[in-house]
Every structure is written in structure tokens, then in C-alpha cells.
Amino acid sequence: MVCTTLYTVCAILFILFIYILLFRKMFHLITDTLIVILILSNCVEWSQGQMFIDDIYYNGNVETIINSTDPFNVESLCIYFPNAIVGSQGPGKSDGHLNDGNYAQTIATLFETKGFPKGSIILKTYTQTSDFINSVEMTCSYNIVIIPDSPNDSESIEQIAEWILNVWRCDDMNLEIYTYEQIGINNLWAAFGSDCDISVCPLDTTSNGIGCSPASTETYEVVSNDTQLALINVVDNVRHRIQMNTAQCKLKNCIKGEARLNTALIRISTSSSFDNSLSPLNNGQTTRSFKINAKKWWTIFYTIIDYINTIVQAMTPRHRAIYPEGWMLRYA
């Protein structure tokens, strides 16, 4: 009887020993594993949240959530126009300029009659079209750029339209050290300055000139001269030597990204060969490019205000085109 009881006690002690040795350690192991998994999952969720925030963050005006029933319920509409059209103040002026000292307040108030919130209209002037490469950043919910159109400036206007309506990513070019090549149809060189006279010499695989002598700039082919802005296209995948006056012009190596869908261009024309299909009065086209045939700038702004719905419907608010990392108009 004593032996049986002793055997029973020994068996119980053995079972407790096994439990302490194995099961309790396993319980702690399982518990520790669950805690580690919980911590890691929270860290993963946090890192994904940070990535999402980084993706949508940019410097500039951050729009509110777009209300589908009220397309003008946005943070800002920026309108860019030449500062040369702001004339001297006084009644009876016939030059067609904005001669009213309160023109900005007048225009903003008229936009409010079309449903735009108070304070959402921002008027900005520029000196020359090359400013859009060098210094102007367009970060409003909607951006409208007004450019005077003339036959003498048709090439530069076409190129600035290409620049404004798309996203570009650019790097500075050091012409004293490097030769450059364009790697695809979306790779262009953007030149801007007071006088961009640029010539190039294409090179073969042995660095000899193709139709030119690299050592003689007089043999280079002229691709731009007497211009403040140029988007230069050369043959892809061919290295080039480039000659220009770096004191009067700057050059950037640029890659075109996607369309800047929150931006529209309005060209002001007085040409008799005006293309009426581009007029907002006829609903325009879906290319985010319009023309207004007028000489008086108050008439131009009245037309833009009255047909702003047509213009804005061709755009998309808060487009992905506004990125950090240089995907802004200044460097883009």
C-alpha cells in the first residue's frame, strides 16, 4: 500500500516535471511568438501608412476632398497671365489692359458668382514664358495659363504648351564635361534664358563627329537661336556635343511623364485665321487647350469666367502629376 502511494506520488511529480519542462516553456514560447507577430504587424501597417502619406505629400496648396456634386468645391484655382497686361490705373483707357487697380478683387468676386468659394481664386503674373521652366510652380487644384498668341511666337507657344500640359523631370546639364544623348521620344532638352543660341554635333561610337567636327563649333548644327525657351529634340541614342552661351541660357535634360491633367492652356489670338473649334464658346476640345479671339483683356477674363465650367470639365482636379522629388514644374 505504501509502495503504491509512493508510485502515485512519483508519477504525479513526474507529470508536473514534464509540464514544467515542456508545456510551460511551450506556452511561453507561443505567447512570445504571438506578441512578436502583433508588434511586427503593427510596424508593417505603420510603414505602409507612411509610404502612402509620402506618396501624396507635396509642397504647395493641399486641396480639400472634391465634392462630386460641386466640382468647384476645391481649395484653389490659379490663373497665370502676363504682367505686361496690367496697365496704369485710370478711367477711359483704350489700350485693352487691366487698368483697374482692384482688378484682382473684381475677377475673384465674379468667379464666386460661378460657385467658387471665397478666397479660392489666385491670380499670378509671369514676365516671360520661360518662367514656367525656371521659377513658376503650379500647385493649385486647378491651373489655367493664359498666353498671348502671335504668328511670330507660334513655335515657342507650341513648346510651352507641351511643357505646361505635361509633367517633366529634369536634371542640370554640365556642357563643359559631358556629352549627352537622348534615350527616347520622351527625352528632350529644355533650354531657357535671355538668348538661347544652341548648336549640336552628333558623335559616332568612336567620338568622331557625324557631319561636323567636335573641335570646331562652326561646324555644329543650329537647333535653337534668338529664343527664350526651346524644347530641343535630337536623334535618340546618339551622343552629342553641345555649344551654347551658358551665361545667357540654361539647359536641362528632361524626361516627360504623364499629362498634367489639372492644368489648361488658353491662347489669346487676334489672328484672322483663328481656329474656332478651340473656342470655349463652342465647347472647345478635350485637349485642355483653348483659344480666345479678343484684344481687350477684360473681355478675355469675362469670357473665361463665363465659360469656366467648360474649361474646368476638360481638366481633372488634384491630379497625380504633382509629385515630390522634383516632379513639379520648376524642375519637372
UniProtKB/Swiss-Prot annotation:
<keyword id="KW-1038">Host endoplasmic reticulum</keyword>
<keyword id="KW-0946">Virion</keyword>
<comment type="function">
    <text>Calcium-binding protein that interacts with rotavirus cell receptors once the initial attachment by VP4 has been achieved. Rotavirus attachment and entry into the host cell probably involves multiple sequential contacts between the outer capsid proteins VP4 and VP7, and the cell receptors. Following entry into the host cell, low intracellular or intravesicular Ca(2+) concentration probably causes the calcium-stabilized VP7 trimers to dissociate from the virion. This step is probably necessary for the membrane-disrupting entry step and the release of VP4, which is locked onto the virion by VP7.</text>
</comment>
<keyword id="KW-0106">Calcium</keyword>
<keyword id="KW-0325">Glycoprotein</keyword>
<keyword id="KW-0732">Signal</keyword>
<keyword id="KW-1152">Outer capsid protein</keyword>
<feature type="glycosylation site" description="N-linked (GlcNAc...) asparagine; by host">
    <location>
        <position position="67"/>
    </location>
</feature>
<dbReference type="InterPro" id="IPR001963">
    <property type="entry name" value="VP7"/>
</dbReference>
<keyword id="KW-1146">T=13 icosahedral capsid protein</keyword>
<dbReference type="GO" id="GO:0046872">
    <property type="term" value="F:metal ion binding"/>
</dbReference>
<comment type="subunit">
    <text>Homotrimer; disulfide-linked. 2 Ca(2+) ions bound at each subunit interface in the trimer hold the trimer together. Interacts with the intermediate capsid protein VP6. Interacts with the outer capsid protein VP5*.</text>
</comment>
<comment type="similarity">
    <text>Belongs to the rotavirus VP7 family.</text>
</comment>
<keyword id="KW-0479">Metal-binding</keyword>
<dbReference type="Pfam" id="PF00434">
    <property type="entry name" value="VP7"/>
</dbReference>
<dbReference type="InterPro" id="IPR042207">
    <property type="entry name" value="VP7_1"/>
</dbReference>
<keyword id="KW-0945">Host-virus interaction</keyword>
<feature type="signal peptide">
    <location>
        <begin position="1"/>
        <end position="49"/>
    </location>
</feature>
<dbReference type="InterPro" id="IPR042210">
    <property type="entry name" value="VP7_2"/>
</dbReference>
<feature type="glycosylation site" description="N-linked (GlcNAc...) asparagine; by host">
    <location>
        <position position="225"/>
    </location>
</feature>
<dbReference type="GO" id="GO:0039624">
    <property type="term" value="C:viral outer capsid"/>
</dbReference>
<keyword id="KW-0167">Capsid protein</keyword>
<dbReference type="GO" id="GO:0044166">
    <property type="term" value="C:host cell endoplasmic reticulum lumen"/>
</dbReference>
<feature type="glycosylation site" description="N-linked (GlcNAc...) asparagine; by host">
    <location>
        <position position="152"/>
    </location>
</feature>
<protein>
    <recommendedName>
        <fullName>Outer capsid glycoprotein VP7</fullName>
    </recommendedName>
</protein>
<keyword id="KW-1015">Disulfide bond</keyword>
<dbReference type="GO" id="GO:0039621">
    <property type="term" value="C:T=13 icosahedral viral capsid"/>
</dbReference>
